[in-house]
Amino acid sequence: MTISHDFVIIKAERFKMLAGAAMKIPIRKPKNRRKAMIFEKQVVNGYKGMMHTRCDDTETVFYFSSDDFAGLQKEAYAFQSSMGHTLQGYLYFYDNFTKDRLIIFDHGFGGGHRAYMKEIEKLCAHGYRVFAYDHTGCMESGGASPNGLAQSLCDLNDCITTIKADECFAGLDISVMGHSWGAFSTLNIAALHPEISHIVALCGFVSVEEMMNTFFAGPLKGYRKAVLALEQESNPQFFSYNAVESLKNANVKALLIYSEDDKLCRRVHYDILEEGLKDKENVHFLLEKNKGHNPNYTTDAVKLLGEFGKARAKFAKKKNATKEEKARFIASFDWHKMTAQDESVWGKIFAHFDK
């Protein structure tokens, strides 16, 4: 295929790297306190390297853009975060979009909003106008790092606060859709903005603490406290948010979508939410099979994505790859097939948003 843009779709790449790195950490019980402190520092530094380092373009994956969809329009819209950073976003829409609705799309970790152009375009094609932005420390936005797992909720709160204060958006019905890191914020945003009408969360983790339980389990459990302390220090205002508590007290129409074989946001998150919210008539669940961390993709796309991940890990071992070599690498994959969307899942998403 002809490459005319730089596309990225590996949203959870750094989560995967963290999980792999964690398994390489020595798990022998240190013989003395000094060694224990050294190991703990290695773990925290490794975590910082994965989760507190800017997410910029690696030039080894693709990003779709609005230019790849005939008639799709975009308008730049930036806002200031409470941390003082400029967060860059864009309004996406086709002609004759629904004037009284706005859907905010919240991206996952490891890239920016353009990793989700297929999802954004589908929402626009259905008649919605979509606002999508890059989080702190990601792609086009400012910030030295993404500042940990709770930062997505901080940024989404700033985003909605800005939109509500802008007369250009006065009176709009606001909904939110997010994936993974962005689904965590989506799950919790109604606690901060109860007027949000609809949310769709794809593979959202319940809380920062529950996500750490996933990464630092078994022999690694002893390192969890130090990493949680880092997360709390990085974002004390939003660290403790829990999706069960946020949704238990909310009236927002919620659709929570997961895949039973997700190795990043594991089935336990679905189970906790389903049990904790079983009496909430406004909260609905969808559990897919064989979809990994992308339940809105087709099963074939998920398989291709997995094959790409393995190939990319191998390619990453090549030292000092040139731009030409990177271009040839990404040109060897069919990115449309790798990002194919499951129409059945999207039918349920649209039915939910259209209520």
Predicted regions and their residues:
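Hydrolase active-site cap/lid region
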Residues: 188-236
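C-terminal catalytic histidine-bearing segment of alpha/beta-hydrolase fold enzymes
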Residues: 281-355
